[in-house]
């Protein structure tokens, strides 16, 4: 079994957080449930407690049935790791699915009339984020793409001006005013193109340029209507249609401005047509058709602009959400890393995370994280008089006092280049020279000892208790690392560590060192003989020569003075910038500011100021996003990831991911195509004669499109339809290939409706009829001849032979075909190449029919009859031979150019939409990838942290930055505590070359502890919590929180007893397979304890109290291979049927005589 087998959990749901919780709403936690010491408290014996949530009894014990150990809710507490939604909605209150939550089921309830009208009005409103700052970011986000689009539009408009100039000047004498207008417009578009590409071009300038373009287009439209010869309500109708379309699609303006501009251009053309053709008998028919045509064009524009902008805003919002989650995770990871590296050295933590990441196969032995360091100094410090101090205060006050003292020691250790290893009760030990080797490691430990003695003097002064520090130092070799699988604590082992532990018996206020340490001091300190062997049997047995430090090194004094001077200078320079904080009270007997400085309380309070002044999370996200927008290059992104013409990703995996994107608005696209079809039908019925066949074709196409819309709507309407229909709907809507095919099919149906009526019209060339009547060749027939024969424009009756009606205004066929092509732009999910191919195929089909098919006669007849109409309007009569030429290019020759211009605009818009969508996808994918990397890193960190601290304790310290002297503790009413030690392991441990200087002995100890950890991980022992290991002693407890405490059944106590017996069995199994004879002593006790963490910056979870001390004594006074329990525990276990025997009265240090029992077995049943 691999060492991390107990850590890795199969990933069931990708949306799980690193805690193993699902992204979703959690059950609300109520702060008022926690009271007393059951809720975390942050107290200090040097100052008043932080005001907790109002509780009825803040200092009384809280029974566990009150759901203790619940964290107080507050900012930053209990934050899920999924994406946090923020108020980023639109001003029109459009509802979008919050990031990181499940998609909300569509609202299928019937809407009222006002509600439907409100939803419809929302479509025409400009979209805008509620936050002005976010809106500016959004505009910056798409600025480069809009700038590129606007530049291309200028080029298209310059080309369009050239086309209009050619159409006007080619057939007849051009009008100078209109030529000058087109020339000026072309020059202005070129100038605007240059302006758009300047580095100083900004968002405000873009809007100004857009409105200038609209003004120029309106002027060109007016000039074209006035210059038309002959005048006609349908003359040049394609031009305002084109202007309206590009207003919605290629101009970067808001929806409201686009709607107003599109309606304005449409109204302008209608007014001009009405004023210039007021005497035409067919004026109102054509004006009605023009109104429908413009309404359809504006509808297409809205159907294109609205989903494109909403998609862009949602993509931006999603990208921002991913960035927000990434920064949130990054912040949490920094806190995790800080907390993790405060407990484990960096090289150990990184190696553990690497092993979790690589997921190595099971090995015969668990991996051991041990390193050897040869030249280090080990310091052990013990508080002399601690028992007297403990007798004068409660357990909580004692823990708070130790916390503040050890927090000060941690600061001193950092200043003196020492690494704190562990805190064992009132014992503090640290090492200098690891993880980085130092030549002055002995000096560092001695200075650390001097500072510790100075610090304890303040405790002695303010408490009135005679406490001192016993400090012992030894230099030599250590093995450092962690053992086991759970609740890792960095530790050191070696014979030199054992020796250093015995060296602390040097006496109060003195530093006791060995000769090995003295040799590293280079004579910088005065010493005297220590005679350690007289006070400690181990030192006497090992013949260790010891010394006592008399005075500090002069060199070190000078260095410290210089450092203190620099710190004072820096503090003075910051004094005007930061308010000085002074605690409300210290120990009950003093408020001496010097004492505060000596204890380091001022400094520790400053440590948290950075957190207070931290940037607001929302502002941090916006600032990061702004920098990312400024740094990214659209052109470079396209070059690196997207093929130039096809706009497909260069990497196949990206293309596959993109192709799996589902467009939820596909049903709306088909509905827009149905709307365009209806408009085309209205135009055809208004302008052209129709037959029963045409009505049947229109009805069939209408039914096909309507059925398609309904099928697509089934996907969003829940389970009201048959399963087969739902499956068909999902297959269409959720498949890019199928939805593209259906989109092309819909456009094809609309195109058929636009050209179907052409085949029912009269196809007889009017020239042929007139030539027969006038005995002329068809080439010689002119408009004047037709005028003489009383032919006129607008007659529906057949002009020549045949019964088919005459289609007098084929310009509307062109307009309807343009509408059918524009309908393809509504389908935003179809690729630009697909739209280009579809446009060319449909356009080519139409041109073949126009130029080579029977309908060609319709367009030739129209050009002649338009000349007749012009002659009639001029009230002049001409001879057939002297007839003036028609002042315009023939419609069938204009049509290919018009189709080409529209195809170019359609392709540019499709390129813009697809390019934007792909770049948004790319950026969101990158943000998602970075977020996932952060989540993986967070998962690794949390797995490590949860093997160092309990989950709720780790969450407490990750919630916000903690001060060094800040305390986290809980009062627990009834906890069972176990100490299990291998009595003869010290005899087994030897340091020889054959066993790699003792590493192999530690490897076996690691296997033993790992087995114990695997057992405690079993479901039946879920109420147990491993506390720590102390050398070869294993410490565990049960009933430490609400989920594991059983007040009625006391199952947590019996679980610990079962675990103790299970360890005895496991040790026998280990002895059989390792050919050893290890003997275990286990001690059990129960009662109240205080559980908490000492050292907020270097947290170490532990439990304290008389219960813990007695449990330890049950182990130390026990008998090998037996489990010794106290009378309190005996009463609980005996009532449950456990087999126990009375040992008798045992003398226990600090407790006198106690009656104890041996646990022999479980219940008889």
UniProtKB/Swiss-Prot annotation:
Phosphothreonine, modified sites: 916
Binding, ATP: 382-387, 424-426, 470, 1028, 1102-1104, 1109-1113, 1149
Main location: membrane
Record-listed E.C. numbers: 4.6.1.1
Enzyme class: lyase
One of the record's GO molecular function terms: adenylate cyclase activity
Cofactor: Mg(2+); Mn(2+)
GO CC terms of this entry: cilium; membrane; plasma membrane; stereocilium
Residues in the Cytoplasmic compartment per record: 1-149, 304-670, 911-1165
Changes after translation: Phosphorylation by RAF1 increases enzyme activity. Phosphorylation by PKA on Ser-659 inhibits the GNAS-mediated increase in catalytic activity. Phosphorylation by PKC on Ser-553, Ser-659 and Thr-916 inhibits catalytic activity.
Subcellular location: Cell membrane; Cell projection, Cilium; Cell projection, Stereocilium
Binding site for Mg(2+) 2: 382-383, 426
Kinase in keyword set: no
Carbohydrate-modified residues: 277, 790, 875
Residues that, per the record, bind Mg(2+) 1: 382, 426
Topological relation to the membrane, as annotated: Multi-pass membrane protein
Protein name according to UniProt: Adenylate cyclase type 6
